[in-house]
């Protein structure tokens, strides 16, 4: 089950990757920016069809070779599922959840039947051409079931969503806490998609993220509080790790941490920072999770409201500024959070003598020069994963290599970190996650090339 959820979380990355560009288009077309209606409507169209985009993206993400036939099957499945369930009961609105179901149907159908050979007189429909046909048949059967069972499920989801929204800041704080606690397992994407794309409805769009860009005055509850963490808190934690580093390693540590901090501040990608201390001190990471939950509670209590299309970095802060509420106060909260994070990290690192970057007893965690990254991926990283023979599947999400290996005991964490990995997670069974950062796609391609 854990492996399935991790794979599902990874598959969310393709459709989510579309949203930053769409967010920029939407922002540029808004009345308060350039007031270009056709540009604004072009961006709105994507948010209006998020379920279809998720169906296509998840189908491709689930498929073993990311083939377009899986994406086509996902689109067919969603269109059929949506139309059929609404015919059975007009109140049915599976929204993004319908897209997820359709993507799963198409992805697993593709994996199972993509190599199927039919008799010669039906040979044209063999292999990948067979997948959309079988997907359609399976979808019709499941649509009949979902058309009947979905209304009570939808009622439960709506009730839970209304209950969480009714909790206000407390509910937002609980979400923020678990959002961070699930990162080590890579399951935070699953939680995020429930809150950001499913809960609440406004003018036909669902989820906190889509509702915010549709100008729902109540949206932003589950996004706003991440800005103080990602733009200010974690960059301040980087500063604390630089200050507490050994004098002989402070310059090298600063070079690495400045890059991490800028990435977090500008884009909102924070995993490279979090994995620098996550496993060194679970207590420190737990404090970080609590502070995240507290941030979501505080900004809600102060009546601050903002949102993002990708993550809570400076880019999305600027793009959302025109439709945000009290955006300047959000910066003040962020500055306060920077002070809190610096003090907490400085004190705990010193008091617990944590071996954060720059405080190691040996050089196993040193990151090699950027000029040797390609060689690292082909040699040291491959060796750290137990060699070609140990690798079964190679995939990735936004910041992590997601691998399946024959024997996790052969995975050498010290070697992987020496190769530039920010962290390693053995998440049960044969699954291994290697945290790389925003350039993970290139690392995955180089690793695939190395094992051929």
UniProtKB/Swiss-Prot annotation:
Disruption phenotype: Deletion of the gene almost completely prevents growth on N-acetylglucosamine, but has no effect on growth on glucosamine. The gamP-nagP double mutant can still grow normally on glucosamine. InterPro entries: Glu_permease_IIB, PTrfase_EIIB_Cys, PTS_EIIC, PTS_EIIC_1, PTS_Glucose_EIICBA, PTS_IIB_1, PTS_IIBC_nag. Residues 1-361 form the PTS EIIC type-1 domain. The chain crosses the membrane at residues 8-28, 42-62, 91-111, 130-150, 163-183, 223-243, 257-277, 279-299, 329-349. Induction: Expression is repressed by the HTH-type transcriptional regulator NagR. The keyword Kinase applies. The active site is at residue 397. GO terms for cellular component: membrane raft; organelle inner membrane; plasma membrane. It is an enzyme of class 2 (transferase). Residues 375-452 form the PTS EIIB type-1 domain. It catalyses: N(pros)-phospho-L-histidyl-[protein] + N-acetyl-D-glucosamine(out) = N-acetyl-D-glucosamine 6-phosphate(in) + L-histidyl-[protein]. Its EC number is 2.7.1.193. Keywords: Cell membrane, Kinase, Membrane, Phosphotransferase system, Sugar transport, Transferase, Transmembrane, Transmembrane helix, Transport. It is a multi-pass membrane protein. GO terms for biological process: N-acetylglucosamine transport; phosphoenolpyruvate-dependent sugar phosphotransferase system. Its main location: membrane. It is found in: Cell membrane; Membrane raft. The EIIC domain type-1 forms the PTS system translocation channel and contains the specific substrate-binding site. The phosphoenolpyruvate-dependent sugar phosphotransferase system (sugar PTS), a major carbohydrate active -transport system, catalyzes the phosphorylation of incoming sugar substrates concomitantly with their translocation across the cell membrane. This system is involved in N-acetylglucosamine transport. PANTHER family: CYTOCHROME C-TYPE SYNTHESIS PROTEIN AND PTS TRANSMEMBRANE COMPONENT, PTS SYSTEM N-ACETYLGLUCOSAMINE-SPECIFIC EIICBA COMPONENT. Interacts with FloT. This is PTS system N-acetylglucosamine-specific EIICB component. It comes from Bacillus subtilis (strain 168).
């Amino acid at each position: 089950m854990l492996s399935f959820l991790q794979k599902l979380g990874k598959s969310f990355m393709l459709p989510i990757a579309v949203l930053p560009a769409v967010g920029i288009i939407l922002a540029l077309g808004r009345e308060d920016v350039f007031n270009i209606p056709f540009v604004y409507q072009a961006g709105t169209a994507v948010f209006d069809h998020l379920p279809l985009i998720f169906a296509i993206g998840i189908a491709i993400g689930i498929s073993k070779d990311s083939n377009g036939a899986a994406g086509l099957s996902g689109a067919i499945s969603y269109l059929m599922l949506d139309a059929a369930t609404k015919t059975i009961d007009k109140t049915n609105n599976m929204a993004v959840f319908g897209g997820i179901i359709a993507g799963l149907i198409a992805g697993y159908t593709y994996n199972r039947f993509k190599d199927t050979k039919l008799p010669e007189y039906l040979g044209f429909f063999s292999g990948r051409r067979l997948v959309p046909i079988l997907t359609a048949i399976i979808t019709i059967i499941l649509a009949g079931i979902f058309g009947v069972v979905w209304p009570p499920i939808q009622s439960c989801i709506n009730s839970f969503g209304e209950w969480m929204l009714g909790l206000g800041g407390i509910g937002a704080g609980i979400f923020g806490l678990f959002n961070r606690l699930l990162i080590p397992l890579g399951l935070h994407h699953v939680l995020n998609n429930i809150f950001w794309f499913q809960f609440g409805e406004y003018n036909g769009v669902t989820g906190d993220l889509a509702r915010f860009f549709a100008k729902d005055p109540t949206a932003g509850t589950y996004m706003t509080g991440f800005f103080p963490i990602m733009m200010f808190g974690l960059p301040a934690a980087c500063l604390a790790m630089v200050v507490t580093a050994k004098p002989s390693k402070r310059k090298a540590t600063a070079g690495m941490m400045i890059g991490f901090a800028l990435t977090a501040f500008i884009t909102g990608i924070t995993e490279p920072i979090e994995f620098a201390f996550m496993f060194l001190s679970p207590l420190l990471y737990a404090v970080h999770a609590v502070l995240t939950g507290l941030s979501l509670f505080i900004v809600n209590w102060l009546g601050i409201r903002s949102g993002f299309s990708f993550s809570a970095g400076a880019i999305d802060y600027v793009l959302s500024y025109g439709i945000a509420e009290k955006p300047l106060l959000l910066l003040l909260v962020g500055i306060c959070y920077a002070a809190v994070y610096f003090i907490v990290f400085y004190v705990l690192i010193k008091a617990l003598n944590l071996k954060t970057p720059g405080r190691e007893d040996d050089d196993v965690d040193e990151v090699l020069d950027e000029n040797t990254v390609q060689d690292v991926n082909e040699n040291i990283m491959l060796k750290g994963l137990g060699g070609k023979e140990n690798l079964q599947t190679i995939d990735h999400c936004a910041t992590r290599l997601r691998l399946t290996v024959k024997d996790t005991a052969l995975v050498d964490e010290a070697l992987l970190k020496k190769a530039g990995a920010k962290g390693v997670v053995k998440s049960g069974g044969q699954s291994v996650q290697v945290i790389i950062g925003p350039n993970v796609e290139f690392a995955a391609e180089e690793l695939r090339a190395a094992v051929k």
